[in-house]
Amino acid sequence: MSAFTPASEVLLRHSDDFEQSRILFAGDLQDDLPARFECAASRAHTQQFHHWQVLSRQMGDNVRFSLVAQASDVADCDTLIYYWPKNKPEAQFQLMNILSLMPSGVDVFVVGENRSGVRSAEPMLADYAPLNKVDSARRCGLYHGRLEKQPQFSLESWWAEYNIDGLTIKTLPGVFSRDGLDVGSQLLLSTLTPHTKGKVLDVGCGAGVLSAALASHSPKVRLTLCDVSAPAVEASRATLAANGLEGEVFASNVFSEVKGRFDMIISNPPFHDGMQTSLDAAQTLIRGAVRHLNSGGELRIVANAFLPYPKILDETFGFHEVIAQTGRFKVYRTVMTRQAKK
C-alpha cells in the first residue's frame, strides 16, 4: 500500500486546498493516503478488514472497521473524502450512512475511476449534496459539493434475502452475489456430499451460502466462517441465524485471525480487490492452507478456469484434482499429506 492509486493521485493535485481541513476518508481505501495526507486532522472508516489492518498501523484509533459508521467516527470532521467503489449499492449504503451523521455545510468530495461508475455520484447525491466535477485526470473524476440536507439512514431497510433449496440467505450491499447464488458457488455446492463431519472453515464466506448449504445436510459439521468484508460477516451471521444454524463468524484477511486446524477448508476466493485484479488472496489461501489443515484434511475451492491455481496447488500440496467443471469454472480439490510444504 505504498504506491498511490490513480484516485489518490488526483486528490494530491489539490492537496493545498485541504491543509486546514479535518477529513473523514471512507469508501474503497486502496492505499494509505488517509494516513499520509497533509491536513489538520484525518480519520478513516472502512468496511474492509485488510484496509483497516494497513491504515491502523499508522492511524491507530483514528481508523475504524465496521459495517456502519457511528457519530464518533465523524466527530469534528468538516470534510468527507469518499473513494467510489465499483459496487453502486455499496456506495449508496456507505454515503447515506456517513452523511446522515455529518452536519449540514460539510464539504463532500467523491473521487473514483471512470470505469467504476463514479459518475453515478452526481444523481445519487443530488438531493443531499449537489456535486460539481472539479477535476478529471488519470481516468478518474473528482467531484465536490456541500451537504445541504442529511439523508435518513436505517440499517434494517438495506437487508435483502433470497432462497435456495429451502434456505434463507441474508444479504447486504457490498456482499458478493447479493442478488442470488453465483454460478461458481453453485458448482462448488454440487460437490459437497451429505453427512460431512469435522471442522470446516469457509474463507471469504460472503453471505454464508456455502456453509449454510453444507450444514443443512451435514448437521455434524462445526462451522467457522471469515471474510474481509464487514457486510459479509454480518450477512453470514444473519444467514446462519435465519436457518437455525450455528457457527463462528469473524473478520479476517484470509487466515490473519484464524486459529487452529480444520478437516476441510472451502472457498470461492475473490480475484478482484475493488477495481483491481488481484490473485493475492487466493495465493495466500492456497499456500496458507497447509498451516490450517489437519493431516488428511481437504482444501476445496472454485475458480474461473483461466486462473493459474493448478500451479500454486501443485507447488504447495504436490498435487490437485479437478472434481467438477463447466466452460467457465473449475472446482479444485487437494489433500494435506506429508508432501505438502508447511
From Swiss-Prot:
Ordered alphabetically, the record's keywords are:
Cytoplasm, Methyltransferase, rRNA processing, S-adenosyl-L-methionine, Transferase
Gene3D superfamilies assigned: Vaccinia Virus protein VP39
> Which of the seven top EC classes does this enzyme belong to?
transferase
Q: Name one GO cellular component term.
A: cytoplasm
Can you state which reaction this protein catalyses?
guanosine(1207) in 16S rRNA + S-adenosyl-L-methionine = N(2)-methylguanosine(1207) in 16S rRNA + S-adenosyl-L-homocysteine + H(+)
Pfam (any one): MTS
Q: Name one GO molecular function term.
A: 16S rRNA (guanine(1207)-N(2))-methyltransferase activity
* Protein localization: Cytoplasm
Q: Report if keyword rRNA processing is assigned.
A: yes
- GO-annotated biological processes: rRNA base methylation
Q: What InterPro entries does the database record attribute to this sequence?
A: DNA_methylase_N6_adenine_CS, Mtase_sm_N, rRNA_ssu_MeTfrase_C, RsmC/RlmG, SAM-dependent_MTases_sf, Small_mtfrase_dom
Give its E.C. classification number: 2.1.1.172
Tell me where on the tree of life, at the top rank, the source sits.
Bacteria
Q: What does this protein do?
A: Specifically methylates the guanine in position 1207 of 16S rRNA in the 30S particle.
Record family assignment: Belongs to the methyltransferase superfamily. RsmC family.
Could you give the subunit structure recorded for this chain? Answer: Monomer.
Name this protein carries in UniProt:
Ribosomal RNA small subunit methyltransferase C
Q: Which organism is it from?
A: Salmonella typhimurium (strain LT2 / SGSC1412 / ATCC 700720)
